[in-house]
Amino acid sequence: LLSRRQRQMCIRDRIDSMNFEEFAKNRHSVRDFAVGTVDESIIRKAVELAQTAPSACNRQSTRVHYIQNRDICKNVLDLQGGAKGHTVSSVIVLTSELSLYRHTSEFKTPYLDSGIYLMNLLYALTYYGIGTCPLIWNDDGEKAEEIRRFVDIPWSEQIVAIIQVGHYATNECKYAASNRRAVFDVLKIH
């Protein structure tokens, strides 16, 4: 459990009055979701918006697997290992189609492309009023094989990330009080 949390009115209730800077600074990972899944039409709209993400040579390798079945969601989250205690609503498994990368020098590119897509998808889901929590995916290969037993993910796709998605549980969101590093700690001008 997180020791410190902050509360604020959910971004979905204020989004129409925000510019991009306010929107970006107010997107937070949430872990408390209402019971029920997100309608497929909202997921489709968010994915369509996320498709504006750039990718190397415009390959657009990222694939989105939306899982609504509660038992499958639980199995995926158990394999992920870091989402224990979180309410389960729906899960997205983000993958990258490896066949689109032909050279060994590109072995990191699927992760880069999908990471950019992931951020775009998080923004898109937030824009449509859906709460998200991206979950780290560390795998030795066995976990991905196990997930493929529950979800029809082709072998040519590498699992890159898992995102817990759902409607906000209440009008007041709780999120981890994680301060961002100061710009001077991150930006180096040469």
Predicted feature locations:
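Single conserved hydrophobic/aromatic residue that forms the stacking wall/gate
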Residues: 1-11
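C-terminal helix-cap and adjacent tail motif
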Residues: 5, 29, 159-190
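Eukaryote-specific, low-hydrophobicity, charge-rich regions
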Residues: 12-45
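Short alpha-helical scaffolding segments that buttress acidic/His motifs in well-ordered protein cores
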Residues: 24-27, 46-50, 92, 163
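Glycine/small-residue-rich phosphate/adenosyl-binding loop
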Residues: 41-48, 55-115
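Small-aliphatic-rich amphipathic alpha-helix that forms the alpha element of a beta-alpha
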Residues: 50-51, 92, 100, 105-147
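Short coil/turn connectors at secondary-structure junctions
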Residues: 86-90, 130, 155-159
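Short, electropositive alpha-helical surface patch
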Residues: 144-158
